[in-house]
Amino acid sequence: MAKATGRYNLISPKKDLEKGVVLSDLCNFLVSQTIQGWKVYWAGIEFDVTHKGMALLHRLKTNDFAPAWSMTRNLFPHLFQNPNSTIESPLWALRVILAAGIQDQLIDQSLIEPLAGALGLISDWLLTTNTNHFNMRTQRVKEQLSLKMLSLIRSNILKFINKLDALHVVNYNGLLSSIEIGTQNHTIIITRTNMGFLVELQEPDKSAMNRKKPGPAKFSLLHESTLKAFTQGSSTRMQSLILEFNSSLAI
């Protein structure tokens, strides 16, 4: 009697389903409060977001800082000395990083429509709103987004997180310390610091860096611990300490 088999399948349907991300996972940014901050669930990934470093960010912005921290303030004058810059929450920083990861994927890969358009919309939603749900109205997108495609998006976000982890602490021997991604309406800059990632969102022309007439900018800090669970970095605690002392950064 003939028997159906999946003998030559590389991934069994069961495993694919287990690892799969459904469209609703990409369109929901679920947040719950914890003692130290928040738990966030997005694209099948759970993030622990903490308040750590935020008090220091506010002190640098309001001139309430120790003289030893002046280098940090002078390194980012367009953030800390700009009357048109505003500090956002770490949840905002995570949203911007995830949006940047999607944009990075759109730049790196020739994704077919409607997938590219759908990802662009999800990226804009993360970047420009603080809502927890995005309503993907296009039925065609829902039909064509297979589990494999969604899982690919998730794995590429994790690859982007590892790209961030590979950055060096800013001001350390001139080594690469930032990732910059330009979209039609924004410039995203993510910089590695001692405490984690300084995330900034500027106008496309980066007018915030104009010293005479600085344009608007938003910024925040996402603590190192939030992304550490997803990285494959091999840096030891001792290497981290050396970087910390050599960089002389407050944040």
Swiss-Prot record:
<comment type="subunit">
    <text>Interacts with host importins KPNA1, KPNA5 and KPNA6. Interacts with host STAT1. Interacts with host KEAP1; this interaction activates host transcription factor NRF2 by blocking its interaction with KEAP1.</text>
</comment>
<keyword id="KW-0922">Interferon antiviral system evasion</keyword>
<dbReference type="Pfam" id="PF06389">
    <property type="entry name" value="Filo_VP24"/>
</dbReference>
<keyword id="KW-1043">Host membrane</keyword>
<dbReference type="GO" id="GO:0055036">
    <property type="term" value="C:virion membrane"/>
</dbReference>
<keyword id="KW-0945">Host-virus interaction</keyword>
<keyword id="KW-0899">Viral immunoevasion</keyword>
<dbReference type="GO" id="GO:0033645">
    <property type="term" value="C:host cell endomembrane system"/>
</dbReference>
<dbReference type="GO" id="GO:0005198">
    <property type="term" value="F:structural molecule activity"/>
</dbReference>
<comment type="similarity">
    <text>Belongs to the filoviridae membrane-associated protein VP24 family.</text>
</comment>
<dbReference type="GO" id="GO:0020002">
    <property type="term" value="C:host cell plasma membrane"/>
</dbReference>
<keyword id="KW-0946">Virion</keyword>
<dbReference type="GO" id="GO:0052170">
    <property type="term" value="P:symbiont-mediated suppression of host innate immune response"/>
</dbReference>
<dbReference type="GO" id="GO:0016032">
    <property type="term" value="P:viral process"/>
</dbReference>
<dbReference type="GO" id="GO:0016020">
    <property type="term" value="C:membrane"/>
</dbReference>
<keyword id="KW-0472">Membrane</keyword>
<protein>
    <recommendedName>
        <fullName>Membrane-associated protein VP24</fullName>
    </recommendedName>
</protein>
<keyword id="KW-1090">Inhibition of host innate immune response by virus</keyword>
<keyword id="KW-1032">Host cell membrane</keyword>
<comment type="function">
    <text>Prevents the establishment of cellular antiviral state by blocking the interferon-alpha/beta (IFN-alpha/beta) and IFN-gamma signaling pathways. Blocks the IFN-induced nuclear accumulation of host phosphorylated STAT1 by interacting with the STAT1-binding region of host importins. Alternatively also interacts directly with host STAT1 and may additionally inhibit its non-phosphorylated form. Plays a role in assembly of viral nucleocapsid and virion budding. May act as a minor matrix protein that plays a role in assembly of viral nucleocapsid and virion budding.</text>
</comment>
<dbReference type="InterPro" id="IPR009433">
    <property type="entry name" value="Filo_VP24"/>
</dbReference>
